[in-house]
Amino acid sequence: MCVPCRSPMACTVCWTASHRREQHAGRDAGSVRLLAATKTRDVGEIMAAIDAGVRMIGENRPQEVMAKAEGLMARCEERGFTLGVADDAGASTIAGEHIPFHLIGQLQSNKIGKVLPVVNTIESVDSLDLAEKISRRAVARGITVGVLLEVNESGEASNPAAIPRMPSASRKNRYIGRT
């Protein structure tokens, strides 16, 4: 994960490391995408990372998504980019013109409506109930949002917040998508 900082050089270091890892793993060039975690960074610093080539950002806290969204959207638009969930269904999706925006931290159900107009993907969803609520709200808004479920595959009690191992996870994922 690349973390935006005051120097675009840091992004160059992340890209170089990513390309080396792709080669080492025998992956196609460009098949690995970096997500810049923007926690504690202001809009100017995030835009410096975007100007340096970052094409996917993630915020850790829902309130930070809400606080930064308007400024980021305006600055991205000035540069010809769309950010997160575009208002216009016909918004450009040409590579390099759209910046996906992820919520990478925990989400409480009372904040779903506040982040849905902005983020493309919500990571670390730790209950099927929350996933279903996200799905219902997204459908009601006519948008699609990615959801990454946190599943406790090991069954260890050390991660009680995660969804217990599900033998029919793919069937459950299809169900959530239909609500």
Label every model-predicted segment:
Residues M1-T179:
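Conserved alpha/beta-domain cores
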